[in-house]
Curated annotation (Swiss-Prot):
SUPFAM superfamilies: Ribulose-phoshate binding barrel (SSF51366). It comes from Thiobacillus denitrificans (strain ATCC 25259 / T1). It is an enzyme of class 5 (isomerase). This is 1-(5-phosphoribosyl)-5-[(5-phosphoribosylamino)methylideneamino] imidazole-4-carboxamide isomerase. The gene is hisA. The active site is at 8 (proton acceptor), 131 (proton donor). It is found in: Cytoplasm. GO terms for biological process: L-histidine biosynthetic process; L-tryptophan biosynthetic process.
């Protein structure tokens, strides 16, 4: 099971939000590329990037920072990127620039046909980001709540060729309150698509809890504020995940 450090980009800086609120942003670095190199040096095997401005604008915004990060980490640490990806041209450009996986969120919810088209055009490179509050999916930078049940919606994407579903519990994101293991496990059990947990991964207990259910289809856990504020030591977390859930799904 991979522990995946997150870099959220706002106005070119590395920030963390509380529950997706843009006006509750803490700046952790004004040099995101240097931060990415730091996580690579700590042994990270993948990096999670979010263009926060892009998520709200519905189009890419932090291109320069994204390009600098991809160049800084090279091919050895694959980058998965979400935020504002709404068309095939954007996906193609990001992949050409060295991003390994693109994450489609709002567009997948509003236009499943686009998701299917993207998976067909770029097999093995498309993930879905499903962000939920109390089990209901939110869109547009978490600013709008839909009536979609997260499990029901995810099951519709079976057979599309989605590489993974990134499941975020909005109520826990950036709050250091612990990951929602039960909801993540329920989603993983319902799907044949691998699941990556996000939101609230705070300490080694969360890593232990997710590792215990990794066999149900959880291949990774994204962590942000915890590794920046020190409640979770990244290297320790990955070592523990390797010991408890190493080799699950070959990651």
């Amino acid at each position: 099971m991979l522990i995946i450090p997150a870099i959220d980009l706002k106005d070119g800086h590395c920030v963390r939000l509380e529950q997706g609120e843009m006006d509750k942003a803490t700046v952790f670095s004004e040099d995101p590329a240097a931060m990415a190199r730091r996580w690579k040096e700590h042994g990270a095997r993948r990096l999670h990037l979010v263009d926060l401005n892009g998520a709200f604008a519905g189009k890419p915004v932090n291109d320069a920072a994204i390009q600098a990060i991809v160049e800084a980490v090279g091919d050895e640490m694959p980058v998965q990127l979400g935020g504002g990806i709404r068309d095939l041209a954007t996906i193609e450009r990001y992949l050409d620039d060295g991003v390994r996986y693109v994450i489609i969120g709002t567009a997948a919810v509003k236009n499943p046909g686009f998701l299917h088209e993207a998976c067909d055009a770029f097999p093995g490179h498309v993930m879905v980001g499903l962000d939920a509050r109390d089990g209901k999916v939110a869109v547009e930078g978490w600013s709008k709540l839909t009536g979609h049940d997260v499990v029901d919606l995810a099951k519709r994407f079976e057979g599309y060729g989605v590489e993974a579903v990134i499941y975020t519990d909005i109520g826990r994101d950036g709050m250091l309150t612990g990951v929602n293991i039960d909801a993540t496990q329920r989603l993983a059990q319902a799907l044949s698509i691998p699941v990556i947990a996000s939101g609230g991964v705070t300490n080694l207990d969360d890593v232990r809890g997710l590792s215990a259910v990794a066999k149900d289809g959880i291949i990774g856990a994204i962590t942000g504020r915890a590794i920046y504020q020190g409640t979770l030591d990244f290297a320790e977390a990955q070592k523990l995940a390797d010991e408890l859930a190493g080799g699950v799904f070959g990651v």
